[in-house]
Regions:
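Substrate-binding/catalytic lobe of Class I Rossmann-like enzymes that use SAM or dcSAM, i.e.
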Residues: 131-137
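Class I SAM-dependent methyltransferase Rossmann-like catalytic core
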Residues: 1-18
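Conserved phosphate-coordination/catalytic loops
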Residues: 3-7, 85, 123
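Conserved SAM-binding loop
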Residues: 15-118, 125-130
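Active-site rim elements
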Residues: 1-3, 116-119
Length: 137
């Protein structure tokens, strides 16, 4: 019998905490589900989302953020890429605003049901996600 281990996003974020430092952007932060895990490891924490909500510091389109080049030491984006229309542009944008030597931590679904929020456009394999970011930066 073949068994597949599913790793949930919280476990991935826990693992990623070793890379979180400095000025940190939570891109597509929504309800900031992981803020309590992320923020203690940062110098500053900024949450950005397309929808205004408590705790969201910047409201805007993650395809073209208002930040200058090399603004963040860490960029975190969890379960957002499947909802954007052009994930390749988001990946390019992440590289643009990440500082040299910084870290980009991304999670994206592969096997998950349709969940429009407001759209549900893509699924990513490990190889596909790696290719997306390799080509972007």
């Amino acid at each position: 019998m073949d068994h597949t281990k599913l790793i949930n996003t919280r476990d991935i974020i826990r693992y990623g905490m070793q890379f979180v430092r400095g000025d940190t952007l939570d891109l597509g932060a929504g309800t900031q589900k992981y803020r309590s895990m992320i923020e203690p490891n940062t110098k500053s924490y900024i949450a950005m989302d397309i929808i205004a909500a408590p705790g969201i510091a910047v409201v805007g389109d993650i395809h073209a953020t208002p930040f200058t080049d090399n603004s963040f030491d860490t960029i975190i984006s969890t379960q957002i890429l499947e909802h954007v229309r052009k994930p390749w542009l988001v990946a390019i944008e992440m590289y643009r605003i990440a500082r040299p030597g910084g870290h980009i931590i991304v999670t994206a679904p592969f096997m998950v049901g349709y969940h429009p929020d407001p759209e549900d456009n893509f699924r990513f394999t490990k190889d596909g996600l790696a290719l997306l970011f390799r080509e972007a930066g």
